[in-house]
Curated annotation (Swiss-Prot):
One Pfam family here: CRCB
Cellular compartments annotated: Cell membrane
Reaction(s) this enzyme catalyzes, per UniProt: fluoride(in) = fluoride(out)
General function of this protein: Fluoride-specific ion channel. Important for reducing fluoride concentration in the cell, thus reducing its toxicity.
Keywords carried by this UniProt record: Cell membrane, Ion channel, Ion transport, Membrane, Metal-binding, Sodium, Transmembrane, Transmembrane helix, Transport
Recorded topology in the membrane: Multi-pass membrane protein
GO MF, any single term: fluoride channel activity
Entry annotated with the keyword Transport: yes
Sites where the protein binds Na(+): G71, T74
Transmembrane domains' residue ranges: 2-22, 33-53, 63-83, 96-116
Species whose genome carries this gene: Lactiplantibacillus plantarum (strain ATCC BAA-793 / NCIMB 8826 / WCFS1)
Identification of the protein by name: Fluoride-specific ion channel FluC 1
UniProt record, GO biological process: cellular detoxification of fluoride
Length: 116
């Protein structure tokens, strides 16, 4: 059990560092109200998670990659915070578009990931 916790924790660190790197690279895109970086991260994470969960990888690898890396990489809380900020800054239409793209796009990406 401790090994599994260690695998998930190590993976989460890798995922969080990857997310941080992408967020930093996307800083020039901040001139648009749509949070492109978080949307990209969550959609690519959903695609990869779909693949991981239906792959024939050993359980330890699924925990490291799925629970760990994808858990640290994707970010529901940042998405919710960005939705609130969009609403507060009078970008309600963009907030609804972002919500729809995140929800429907995430489901589509998970499905596509299962086909890989």
């Amino acid at each position: 059990m401790l090994v599994l916790v260690g695998l998930a924790g190590a993976g989460a660190a890798v995922g969080a560092l990857s997310r941080y790197g992408i967020m930093r690279l996307a800083l020039p895109l901040n001139r648009w109200p749509l949070p492109i970086a978080t949307l990209f991260i969550n959609l690519t994470g959903a695609l990869l998670l779909g693949w991981i969960l239906t792959s024939s990888l050993p359980p330890n690898w699924q925990i490291f990659l799925g629970t760990g890396i994808m858990g640290g990489y994707t970010t529901f809380s940042t998405m919710i915070n960005e939705l609130v900020l969009l609403g507060r800054n009078h970008h309600q239409r963009v907030a609804w578009e972002y919500f729809g793209l995140s929800l429907v796009g995430g489901l589509v990406m998970v499905y596509l990931g299962t086909l890989i």
